[in-house]
A protein has these predicted regions:
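Boundary/activation segment at the start of structured domains
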Residues: 1-3
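Electropositive polyanion-binding surfaces
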Residues: 9-197
Length: 197
């Protein structure tokens, strides 16, 4: 009775996305649960010539195609967000919009934020943002990588690589640990945190 017209958002035509420059060839990847159908963010880690890394955070941008007072804007105002419940969800966007803008493997429009990080794990540049087309190389799934990348295994460079982008994840893990240490927030033997969401 709460959804007399059903829970699916009505299919609405997706306008042409504005022309965007192509990003550099980056090893961009996403990490999500196996059930995730709306992949809205991705990461990249690129080696810099003088040492250090350039870290990219890439966000899906369906707003590129949302015009004021358009049918899709009306749907979004009605729904406001994706609603999650145990065992399922009601998406804010229609399926054809999700398929167009989800960061599945392949070339996708994104809003990217780039920052350079030195070998000492200090942020070495002012963040830069760009609207661009980025080729997502890998959609990693937590259930697939967790057995090979956790507190007990997979973090050392001396261990074999078990899945795509594991070297980049190892570096991001070290970066996170070093930043926590620099902020006096690192807990080596932290009590496990559980997410029941």
């Amino acid at each position: 009775k709460h959804f007399p017209q059903g829970t699916a958002a009505p299919e609405t035509a997706v306008p042409a996305v504005p022309e965007l420059p192509d990003a550099a060839d980056l090893p961009a990847f996403s990490i999500d649960d196996a059930e995730t159908s709306e992949i809205d963010d991705a990461l990249s880690v690129q080696d810099l010539p003088g040492g250090g890394k350039r870290v990219g955070i890439h966000i899906a941008v369906p707003t590129l195609a949302i015009a004021e007072n358009s049918p899709i804007e009306t749907i979004i105002k009605q729904r406001q967000s994706t609603a999650y419940y145990p065992g399922g969800k009601i998406t804010m966007l229609p399926d054809n919009w999700i398929q167009t803008f989800s960061l599945d493997e392949g070339k996708r429009p994104v809003l990217s934020l780039y920052v350079e990080v030195g070998e000492d794990f200090q942020v070495a540049s002012t963040p830069q943002t760009r609207l661009e087309n980025l080729t997502i190389k890998h959609n990693l799934r937590i259930q697939d990588i967790e057995p090979h990348f956790n507190a007990d295994t997979g973090l050392s460079e001396n261990e074999p690589v078990q899945f795509p982008c594991q070297p980049q994840l190892r570096w991001l893990y070290r970066f996170a640990v070093e930043r926590q240490k620099q902020r006096d927030r690192y807990e080596e033997n932290r009590t496990p945190q559980y997410d029941y969401g």
